[in-house]
């Protein structure tokens, strides 16, 4: 995990026109665009991450998933609902920042897990 500022606050959160990505600009000037697919397969929900070590799942067939809704959760996160019905992940500002910093490696890791499981993005 990369070093994070003590306090993160999004100045702007914008859903792309086709709902296939989420743009976030933080108050420290950092900007990132995260694909709906990456957010879905790395959802911080227990459904995806599991309840303990070694329980993480590898959702297949998410290449065309889109974001159907964004809902603020207090002043620290958003709940993202996806076109496949998944809506249990709370994405804190720290998680969104971290995913932005590590998105290339997260995608590589996901594709490796998917291949090992015999799954497909489509």
Give residue spans per PLM region:
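Motif-centric detector for short Cys/His coordination patterns
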Residues: 1-122
């Amino acid at each position: 995990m990369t070093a994070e500022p003590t306090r993160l606050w999004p100045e702007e959160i914008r859903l792309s026109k086709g709902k296939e990505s989420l743009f976030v600009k933080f108050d420290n000037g950092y900007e990132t665009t995260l694909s709906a697919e990456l957010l879905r397969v790395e959802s911080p929900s227990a459904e995806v991450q599991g309840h303990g070590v070694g329980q993480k799942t590898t959702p297949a067939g998410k290449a065309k998933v889109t974001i159907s809704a964004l809902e603020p959760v207090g002043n620290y996160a958003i709940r993202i609902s996806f076109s496949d019905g998944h809506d249990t992940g709370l994405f804190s500002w720290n998680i969104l920042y971290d995913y932005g910093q590590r998105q290339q490696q997260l995608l590589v890791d996901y594709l490796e897990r998917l291949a090992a499981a015999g799954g497909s993005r489509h």
